[in-house]
Amino acid sequence: MARVCQVTGKRPMSGNKRSHAMNATKRWFAPNIHSHRFWVASKKRFVALRLSTKGIRLIDKFGIEYFFTKIYPKK
């Protein structure tokens, strides 16, 4: 699976690692992704999401129902 947050859309990005002598070598910066289950009261079930820590904090702030409609739109 891709290392992408399902709420914020954060994904790995490339950059430079710098040594003490300021030599640049390419490297990847990966987001802090966690698998987390949330209880969705309207559906009466758990939903498992892969989120960055920022995404978990946003769900704690606004609630899972707010993001649930964006992640799983009605068909």
Swiss-Prot record:
Record keyword Ribosomal protein present: yes
Keyword annotations from UniProtKB, A to Z: Ribonucleoprotein, Ribosomal protein
Lineage of origin: Bacteria, Pseudomonadati, Pseudomonadota, Gammaproteobacteria, Enterobacterales
Key word Ribonucleoprotein present: yes
Molecular function GO labels: structural constituent of ribosome
Homology family: Belongs to the bacterial ribosomal protein bL28 family.
Gene Ontology CC entries for this record: ribonucleoprotein complex; ribosome
GO biological process, one term: translation
Record-given protein name: Large ribosomal subunit protein bL28
Species annotation: Blochmanniella pennsylvanica (strain BPEN)
